Amino acid sequence: VSESALIAELSPVRLLGKATGMIGVFTGLGQMIFLPLGLFMADSLGYASTYITAGLIGFLGFAMCLRIPKIKVTLAEDNDEEVNIIRVPTWKLVAVPALALTTFSMSYGAISSFLSPAMQELDAARGASLAGIMLSIVGGAAMIFRYFAGVVADRTGAPGSLYIPSQIMAIIGVGTISLTLFMESSIWWLVLGAVLFGGAFGIAQNEALLSMFDRLPRERVSEASAIWNIFYDSGTGLGSTLLGAMVAGYGYDGAFGAGVAILIAGLLLTTADFILGRTRVSETNDIRTRLRRMRKV
């Protein structure tokens, strides 16, 4: 939560897309390197070695935090002008990008939990060798495309412009996984589906965060970051649980098919938001809120 809010405070607005994209690059790179390294250390040196190493890395992070430059944080000022401004509830401003992100993270919860065993069930020989690196493939694609989304946002000055294309890309990716498992096709189609979804998920992560930063004033970037993390993590947990429950009754293909349906629901949500964008609520002095206030008076 704090890193995203800090990046928003440190970075100039014209570079905010790349800055948030770099969060994904370093997070993804760290996972790609240290997840397999941790498994190797646990097998060869024992689990204690992994916890000790993680603790030492934590101290390194603490030392780096001491080098963060001091900044003047933007705060909401309680003056007469602020009192007279009619504000819109936060949830109205961030509901669409947050819920759309949840549809992605729900599908990611299913992919991270069940894609590897599904691959082994489809092709025991090649599935066993590929299953161990599938999360790295998804994470690598997400890392690259998240930074790409940040570059596009900085150049166009329009955060959220790639949200709908990323949803279509994710639907194709998860749909490919579901259809491959249903038809028992080549396992390489699963790899393609994972790459497509990973790339789409990376774009969606950055677009959701930038959209929230864009819709909320600068003094509320901490709220935007917290909301982003809440919906991301809750979606991952819901996806693992709800779609996992479907595996028992409908198989892996049915669970991923349900993931496609969830992504389609998110696409309809963002499409409606895009069409109604001209009348979308703003952070202050929204017409609908003004009329409602006048009726009460």
Regions found by a protein language model. Give the residues of each.
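A membrane-interface helix-boundary motif in multi-pass transporters
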Residues: D43-G55, V247-I262
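Short amphipathic helix-loop junctions that connect adjacent transmembrane helices
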Residues: S113-S129
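Helix-to-loop junctions at the C-terminal end of transmembrane segments
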Residues: R146-A158
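C-terminal membrane-cytosol helix-exit motif in multi-pass small-molecule transporters
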Residues: L56-A76, L269-D273
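Helix-loop-helix hairpin linking two adjacent transmembrane segments in secondary transporters
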Residues: I23-L66
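Cytoplasmic helix-loop-helix junction between adjacent transmembrane helices
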Residues: V1-V25
